[in-house]
Design a protein with these regions (language model features):
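Generic recognition of short, well-ordered alpha-helical interface segments
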Residues: 10, 14, 159, 163, ...
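Glycine-rich phosphate-binding loops that contact phosphosugars or nucleotide phosphates
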Residues: 40-176
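Serine-centered coil/turn micro-motif
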Residues: 30, 130, 190-191
Length: 203
């Protein structure tokens, strides 16, 4: 096996180990269920917030939430600090904030704003003593994982955040009894909706 393939295999193995740690962590806390219950009763929308790679993960998580029945939009922390906070409906919306370290300075003013206006915050971090979790209503502590590629860029951590977000969206979908009929309404185009419509017509 050449060196490139060895690197590829090592990367995948490292990320599999990270996902295994995430899977095992679900049994150690009830906060995931608390987050599901809160989002399932949401009156407004879920604003998913992050900085850098965490924001990019948040874009996907937000899209999945909306796709499966939980209204959601994603914001970079920078945009929220420059007028985006006006998008938050007090007493209706919930913030879902992703940050590996939980110490990103861009989050500071956002978390203070949320606390001052009694806006619920679901904080997701890998650091138990982080600023993010201190300010969060629901504190989600994910396991510390080894980043693939000498820890030079978020890799394994981005993957477990994404997997956690998918788990949240699917659990909320089940809780809200989101079915094929509702899925078709929000997916008028694409192969998934077309396949479901064809099955429905046959039945």
């Amino acid at each position: 096996m050449n060196k490139d393939l060895q690197i590829a295999k090592k990367t995948v193995q490292t990320e599999i180990q990270a996902l295994t740690k995430l899977s095992k962590s679900f049994g150690r806390s009830s906060y995931f269920s608390t987050a599901v219950n809160l989002l399932s009763k949401i009156k407004g929308k879920c604003l998913v917030v992050g900085v850098g790679k965490s924001y990019l993960v948040g874009l996907k998580v937000s899209a999945t939430l909306s796709s499966l029945g939980t209204p959601s939009v994603a914001f970079s922390a920078n945009d929220l600090q420059h007028g985006g906070l006006g998008a938050i409906q007090k007493n209706h919306d919930i913030l879902l904030v992703f940050s590996v370290s939980g110490e990103s300075l861009e989050l500071n003013s956002i978390l203070k704003y949320a606390n001052e206006h009694k806006i619920s915050v679901i904080g997701v971090s890998c650091k138990s003593s982080s600023m993010l979790l201190r300010y969060s209503t629901i504190k989600i502590l994910l396991p510390k994982v080894i980043e693939a590629g000498h820890s030079l860029a978020p890799t394994s951590s981005s993957l477990i955040f994404l997997s956690w977000g998918d788990s949240l969206a699917i659990a909320c979908m089940r809780k809200q009894k989101w079915d094929n009929k509702k899925f078709i309404l929000t997916h008028p185009s694409g192969t998934l909706a077309t396949a479901l419509i064809q099955v429905k017509e046959i039945m």
